[in-house]
Amino acid sequence: MTITPPEQQVKRVRVAFVSNPVETSFEKWSRPGHFSRLLSKGPNTTTWIWNLHADAHDFDNHTTDLEDISRKVFSAHFGQLAIIEIWLSGMFFHGARFSNYEAWLLDPIHVKPSAQIVWPIVGQEILNGDVGGNFQGIQITSGLFQLWRSCGITSEFQLYITALTGLIFSAVLFFAGWFHYHKAAPKLEWFQNVESMLNHHLSGLLGLGCLSWAGHQIHVSLPINKLLDSGVNPAELPLPHDFILDKSLISQLYPSFSKGLAPFFTFHWSEYSDFLTFRGGLNNVTGGLWLTDVAHHHLALAVLFILAGHMYKTNWKIGHDIKGLLESHTGPFTGQGHKGLYEIFTNSWHAQLSLNLAMMGSLSIIVAQHMYSMPPYPYIAIDYGTELSLFTHHYWIGGFCIVGAAAHAAIFMVRDYDPALNFNNLLDRVLLHRDAIISHLNWVCIFLGLHSFGLYIHNDTLSALGRPQDMFSDSAIQLQPVFAQWIQNTHYLAPTLTAFNLVSPTTPVWGGDVVSISGKVAMMPIKLGTADFLVHHIHAFTIHVTVLILLKGVLFSRSSRLIPDKASLGFRFPCDGPGRGGTCQVSAWDHVFLGLFWMYNSISVAIFHFSWKMQSDVWGTVLANKVSHITGGNFSQGSLTINGWLRDFLWAQSSQVIQSYGSPLSAYGLMFLGAHFVWAFTLMFLFSGRGYWQELIESIVWAHNKLKVAPNIQPRALSITQGRAVGVAHYLLGGIATTWSFFLARIISVG
């Protein structure tokens, strides 16, 4: 039996801060590079501006004091949130001032959402298309109108008030950022108190956040949406606070309100089943999730999170201790287990950030999967442009977050990892057998790449030879995704097998009937076949290669056989000095650089798959009980070959963006062209030798010297790392903007 010493049991938690630690002054604003002795001297060469941008937010470079770094990060978070509030306020203001929101509310099926009007300066007013409701503007695909309706916002005046509230909140956040750095700055112990932080974040942010949202949905959103669904004019609705203050009003819609809180305290909770439901599936009026299901979901989450926020030990003797939890995780093959991880996560914010980015990135991709299959807001399911935009948007965010996770994991390894404190724990053991991990992962990538592309090349070859009977397809040699089909069927049967309280399956994707709104498909069963089997293995390949590059960068960031002292060279370095061949582009930063390209590959294939699959097999119109899809179900045959992807998807569907000139969609045509140019321009940075450019610059400088117009600041060619950074940034920018314009011009035209 282990007896805990009494001094370990009592860990007094308090809010520890220092008053007036840093004087408020604008003086530093006028001194670029004030955080570095070298940069603050000003520029001698053009490299100065690059180093300024690279290091301005790298607080580790400014100071080694973890407390000061923590305060800077904490303060910067308030500034970031304030900027987000201003941005959101702008969204609401556009909805109030420049939109057809009220017209859309009256007829969300035929009126398209618009919250942007282009001013006529040199003829750009052509972009203002007729979106219905006697309004001309740019069609938006953000999903904000559908979100606002589900919140219960029924007038543009309410949007003005919300926009103003956002601005006031942003001012409060700016003040908080200044206050907690200059007036009352927390001590390091406050940042490192994980139990208290977990309790407050779980109970406060998530628990009370969900509870307040559930309250809003029950008291405001539900009655307003029920009346809107039944055809009541938004202008004739009672105001939101009327439903809150006048119980008789809401009781007419949901009779259990007349019983008050008695059923709650007597545990007769089923009495509330008129507004807290467990129906599953989609509302057949709006095509969105049942709002009563959504309110129930948030209430359940609130209970879970509020309970979760009471689990961790602070000033009382009960509860979990994170350090204890981690260190008790040992097994027969894991050595010291998680010993040392607590110290890592409380002393390295890069390690903490890495973990959070990996989880948030994965969550964003999960959100993308749910946004189309379980559309959360009314009428969003029949707004195909918005559905496609939200899927793509959440995929990109997920991809960038996951690459960021690898980047900060590598920075942690280089800057914060101490081998002496991590002897024979899980992290040490992973590092010790990194060669086995990477070589196995490499083999998996080769296997997946050869076989997945091999299947396509087989099909391309036999298609060219005119032998369709020998191709892999649903009508010849079938490769059915049997496991995926089994999962679909299991979910479809859930109400009769596992979830007896559920009225219907969670989404029509699993099987069942088509859900259509005014003759337009909202969602329907998605059949999977050989074509999906093939492209899913391309997904597996691209994702595994991305992981291979990123994980290799992390595991070899401190040392490798080639450069045993890599840790001393830092997170990013071009080469290990002159005269050492083969040591260029092996830094952890270079792995992030390469990982970004493969992340781009992974996401492009996934969003292309989604776009084509939905147009082919889901989206369309219902006439005489028959579904007519946008591309007539051509995915199952067209996507079996690489040639088919090029011909039937990229080429066939780019006609709208290429022919958009002279129409309200012409901006997408120009963006498509411009983004291709930006993308192509990056190849000059990515395939280029620095020496060539430096020589060219020297000769241009020589000419300037001859004419006595030489600059004081010497021009320098970009370093290898700078060139790669500029290259990858614009490669991704060009690629994303090309895809964006291609998708939107297409789906707005045909959707």
Swiss-Prot record:
One cellular component term from this protein's GO annotations in UniProt: photosystem I
A molecular function GO annotation: chlorophyll binding
Stored PANTHER family: OUTER MEMBRANE PROTEIN, OMPA-RELATED, PHOTOSYSTEM I P700 CHLOROPHYLL A APOPROTEIN A1-RELATED
InterPro entries tied to this protein: PSI_PsaA (IPR006243), PSI_PsaA/B (IPR001280), PSI_PsaA/B_CS (IPR020586), PSI_PsaA/B_sf (IPR036408)
Cofactor note: P700 is a chlorophyll a/chlorophyll a' dimer, A0 is one or more chlorophyll a, A1 is one or both phylloquinones and FX is a shared 4Fe-4S iron-sulfur center.
Official protein name in the record: Photosystem I P700 chlorophyll a apoprotein A1
Disulphide bond pairs: none
Compartment(s) of residence: Plastid, Chloroplast thylakoid membrane
Protein task: PsaA and PsaB bind P700, the primary electron donor of photosystem I (PSI), as well as the electron acceptors A0, A1 and FX. PSI is a plastocyanin/cytochrome c6-ferredoxin oxidoreductase, converting photonic excitation into a charge separation, which transfers an electron from the donor P700 chlorophyll pair to the spectroscopically characterized acceptors A0, A1, FX, FA and FB in turn. Oxidized P700 is reduced on the lumenal side of the thylakoid membrane by plastocyanin or cytochrome c6.
UniProt xrefs under Gene3D superfamilies: Photosystem I PsaA/PsaB (1.20.1130.10)
Catalytic activity as recorded in UniProt: reduced [plastocyanin] + hnu + oxidized [2Fe-2S]-[ferredoxin] = oxidized [plastocyanin] + reduced [2Fe-2S]-[ferredoxin]
Family from the record: Belongs to the PsaA/PsaB family.
Keyword vocabulary terms for this entry: 4Fe-4S, Chlorophyll, Chloroplast, Chromophore, Electron transport, Iron, Iron-sulfur, Magnesium, Membrane, Metal-binding, Oxidoreductase, Photosynthesis, Photosystem I, Plastid, Thylakoid, Transmembrane, Transmembrane helix, Transport
Keyword Chloroplast: yes
Transmembrane segments: 73-96, 159-182, 198-222, 294-312, 349-372, 388-414, 436-458, 533-551, 591-612, 665-687, 725-745
Residues that hold phylloquinone according to the record: 693
Binding site for chlorophyll a': 676
Top-level taxonomy: Eukaryota, Discoba, Euglenozoa, Euglenida, Spirocuta
Keyword flag Metal-binding: yes
Binding annotation for chlorophyll a: 684, 692
Known EC number: 1.97.1.12
A GO BP annotation: photosynthesis
Gene encoding the protein: psaA
Positions that bind [4Fe-4S] cluster: 575, 584
HAMAP family hit by this protein: PSI_PsaA
Record text on subunit structure and interactions: The PsaA/B heterodimer binds the P700 chlorophyll special pair and subsequent electron acceptors. PSI consists of a core antenna complex that captures photons, and an electron transfer chain that converts photonic excitation into a charge separation. The eukaryotic PSI reaction center is composed of at least 11 subunits.
Membrane topology, record value: Multi-pass membrane protein
